A protein has these predicted regions:
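Active-site mouth of glycoside hydrolases
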Residues: 1-243
Length: 243
């Protein structure tokens, strides 16, 4: 406060413990989430106390709070996931699609924001010191996910995104023929012969850590055709709005 700071962002409090960089923003002695119990659904008593105490002391000094929810949450098998294995941490766009991951995020948000801080007597949702609650950090349904492509256990989540993209295309165009017509420009068609939304085989758009890029004047039938890109972005924005 003496340096003029009036807002603090409480970032990545959900990060797991372990070796760097996996635990890049979590206290190894008392993390907020007690992953030692085999899931990420319970608070570590000391970790929650540290969180509450820090928030209260910031408030005492006139510093407002920016609360992050999901940042580096480690989704593990003990959370009761839809698919076998651990989904892992920092998986970005997938928690915006999968219903079970969304349920887990809601559960965490309710527990964190609605419990009463013993040092202030207020829950975060009622505390005027909280000026922002950020639901997701660097997350978007249109974000690239190439960093997870090498992981076989993430395939069910990638398949889920593709299925929902194909369902979106069917709602928009109804038939493969109409989709093909919409994706054709000056005799070039972006829809491959082996792609059919009825069969769920139309590929979406992927990229690296950032939103995939598209050059509007690139080859129309390229791997990221402007037509495919436009529909995938519309689809992703729809997911973002419903999240």
């Amino acid at each position: 406060a003496s340096m003029g700071v009036n807002v603090i962002r409480l970032h990545a409090a959900d990060a797991p413990i372990g070796e760097e960089p996996r635990s890049w923003s979590s206290c190894k002695e008392a993390p907020l989430l007690d992953y030692e119990k085999g899931n990420g659904r319970e608070f570590h008593p000391e970790g929650l106390d540290r969180f509450d105490y820090f928030a209260a002391k910031l408030k005492e000094r006139g510093i407002y709070l920016h609360i992050d929810l999901i940042v580096a949450r480690d989704f593990v098998e003990g959370d009761g996931l839809d698919y076998p294995g651990n989904a892992g941490t920092c998986i970005k766009r997938f928690p915006m699609y999968n219903k079970r991951l969304i349920e887990l995020q809601k559960e965490y948000a309710k527990k964190l924001l609605c419990h009463v801080n013993p040092y202030t007597g207020l829950a975060l949702i009622d505390d005027p010191a909280v000026i922002t609650v950020q639901i997701n950090n660097e997350e978007s349904a249109i974000k690239g996910t190439m960093e997870t492509d090498y992981r076989e256990d993430m395939q069910p989540y990638r398949d889920e995104v593709q299925k929902r993209f194909n369902d979106f295309l069917l709602m928009k165009y109804a038939t493969r023929e109409r989709l093909k017509e919409a994706w054709t420009f000056e005799g070039e068609c972006a829809l491959a012969d082996n792609e059919d939304p009825v069969k769920g085989t139309v590929r979406g758009v992927d990229g690296n850590f950032y939103q995939p890029e598209c050059e509007p004047k690139r080859d129309w039938n390229g791997e990221v055709s402007p037509a495919r890109y436009a529909d995938f972005m519309e689809f992703g924005i729809t997911i973002n709005r419903s999240f």
